[in-house]
Amino acid sequence: DWKKTTFTHRSGLMLKAASLLRENREKYAHTITLEMGKPIAEARAEVDKCAGACQFFAEFSEGFLADEFVVTEAGKSLILYQPTGAILAIMPWNFPFWQVIRFAAPVLMAGNVGLLKHAPNVTGCSLLLENIFLEAGFPEGVFQSLVMGNHLAETVIQSDTVQGIA
C-alpha cells in the first residue's frame, strides 16, 4: 500500500524520477515543443525545472510533513499529516511538464496517489510523465494519466475514489 511506504523509499524513487528527467531531457523537450509549440530552449528549461523540483521534494518532504507539537489555547496540540488518498489534477497545456510535476512530486511524497487529467493537446506529455514515474519504480497506479475528453472530467471528480482536486 503506497501510503504505508517510508519517506526513504519514496525519496529514492523521486530522485530516480529526477535523474530520468535529466537523462532524457531532449526527448521530453522535443515532445513539449512538438505538442504545444514551446520553443525548444524553453522546453529544455521546463524539464530542468521539473528535475529540480523532484529532487527538492525528495530531499525535504519528510521535514515538511513531520509531526509537530504546538502550544495552543488547549495546551499542547499535535499537528499530524496523513495521506489523503487519490488526488486529481486537471492541468492546462501551457506548461505540460511543470504544472504536473509541481502537483505530483509533493502529492506522491506525502503518500497520496496522483491522477492526471491533462489538456487534450498534450496527451504525449501526459503519457511520458506517467512513464517517468513507472520507470523510476513507482508502483503501477500510484500516478496515472487519464486520457479522456474534457466532458468526462466531472465523472471522475464525482467518483468516490477521488479524495481531493488540485
Residue ranges and their predicted role:
Residues D1-F64, A74:
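Glycine-rich loop-to-alpha-helix module at the N-terminal edge of alpha/beta enzyme cores
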Residues A66-A166:
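Rossmann-like NAD(P) dinucleotide-binding subdomain of oxidoreductase/dehydrogenase enzymes
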